[in-house]
Structure formats: C-alpha cells, structure tokens
C-alpha cells in the first residue's frame, strides 16, 4: 500500500475533539498487533502524488474523496491538464438543505463540514469541468448508524474485520442529548458504496455554486447559472 501524506491546512479546522479520534484509532490493539508497521511512503506530497498518478495512467481515473477537496484543488492549480485524466469525482460533501452540520461561531449553520473546511478548494473544483457525483447530507441522512446495526456488529465481533469496525464506531456513540451527535451517519460508507455500485443510489442534476465568504461560507447553493452536479 502506497501512502502520500498531505501538508494541506484548513481554512476552518474540524473541532479538536473530532481530530483526536484519529489518534484513538491509531492506538487500537488490533492495528498494533504486528510490528513493525510498514507502509510505502511516497516522496511526494498528496497533491503532487495525485498529479503523478493521473499523468501516469493510460485511462481516465475516477476519484473518491470523503474529506475536503484541498489536495485536488492544489493539484488542479499546479497542473490544470490533469483534468483530462479524471473520469468522475465521487465526493461526500455539501448539502442543499436549509441547514447543514456546521455549528461554529459566526456561522449560520448552513454549510456541510467538508466544504466548510476549505470553501475555496470546493469553489476551485466547481470551476473545473470535472463531472461531480455528489453525495450530500440529504443522501447520507438516509443511512443512519442505528442501534440495531451496532448490536449486530457486537454479536459478530468474533470476525476480526467486524470487531475493528465496531471498535472504530464505538468512538462515536449515540449521544441523545447532543443534537449534532445524537445519530452518526454513514457518510463515507455511502459515498464509497455508490462508487462501487452506482445503481445503489438515484441521482438528479442540480445546478449549483459554493459560497466562500460571509456567515454562509462553505454553503453549497442551487443556482440557475451554476455548474451541474449529479446529486
């Protein structure tokens, strides 16, 4: 497995508590049973390695992004010709609902976090000609992580992969007294699944734009003269 690290930094960082979850997962015994842990590190940064991979491909490459678009935007800025090598972009981000999932000071709450993290990056990708398959909150809200699913994982924890899955999601338990954490949704799972099985979802074309400034920064909006995305 080849990994390229990113040196991209947020315009609006995720809450510290969320970021700390990465260290918790990294410390899980199941990931540290066999040492030393070795990965093939790319000498390039993430956006540079993306350029390399796209340029070396003999065919168009579909991209799956389940976080902010900063590295893709940086790659497009550095070498705009890579757009010719990209098939589709499957992205978990944005929402056209009245309210998003951002609760941050001096923000009106209409944005989704992956856009809000770097609104300018999303805007840059929107300005490209890349076909965007958007998995927004209105889609992911239909796939909550229910207690029944958690219980089923618990009963099947003898299976190593299921045990790891359950341990990871146990870090984000249902907290019924906190609105933003009352239910966890399978954002990244749905996005990845829709890439591998397109008939899993129904899509429609929406003309849209990204707001980059003001109290609504990071919001995706329907716009008659905006660029089309498959929602």
Regions found by a protein language model. Give the residues of each.
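Short, surface-exposed amphipathic charged segments that create phosphate/polyanion-binding patches used
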Residues: 16-24, 103-108, 150-151
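Surface-exposed loop and adjacent secondary-structure segments within mature catalytic domains
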Residues: 4-36, 40
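Short N-terminal amphipathic alpha-helices
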Residues: 1-5, 208
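Active-site histidine-anchored catalytic micro-motif
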Residues: 1, 32-140, 147
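Short N-terminal secondary-structure initiator segments
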Residues: 30-48, 160-170, 177
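Short hydrophobic/aromatic-rich motifs at helix boundaries and adjacent loops
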Residues: 19-24, 44, 93-94, 161-165
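Conformational coupling and interaction surfaces
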Residues: 113-116, 120, 126-128, 132-231
């Amino acid at each position: 497995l080849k990994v390229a690290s990113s040196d991209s930094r947020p315009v609006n960082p995720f809450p510290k508590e969320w970021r700390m979850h990465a260290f918790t997962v990294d410390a899980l015994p199941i990931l540290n049973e066999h040492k030393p842990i070795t990965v093939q590190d790319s000498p390039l940064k993430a956006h540079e390695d993306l350029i390399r991979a796209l340029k070396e491909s003999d065919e168009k490459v579909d991209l799956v992004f389940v976080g902010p678009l900063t590295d893709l935007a940086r790659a497009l800025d550095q070498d705009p010709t890579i757009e010719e090598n990209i098939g589709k972009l499957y992205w978990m981000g944005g929402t056209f609902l009245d309210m998003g999932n951002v609760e941050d000071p001096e923000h009106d709450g209409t944005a989704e976090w992956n856009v809000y993290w770097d609104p300018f990056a999303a805007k840059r990708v929107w300005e490209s000609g890349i076909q965007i398959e958007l998995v927004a909150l209105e889609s992911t809200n239909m796939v909550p992580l229910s207690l029944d699913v958690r219980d089923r994982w618990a009963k099947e924890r003898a299976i190593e992969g299921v045990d790891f899955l359950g341990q990871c999601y146990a870090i984000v338990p249902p907290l019924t007294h906190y609105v933003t954490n009352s239910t966890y949704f399978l954002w990244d799972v749905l996005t990845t699944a829709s890439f591998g099985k397109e008939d899993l979802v129904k899509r429609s074309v929406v003309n849209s734009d990204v707001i980059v400034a003001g109290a609504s920064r990071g919001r995706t909006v329907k716009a008659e003269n905006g660029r089309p995305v498959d929602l």
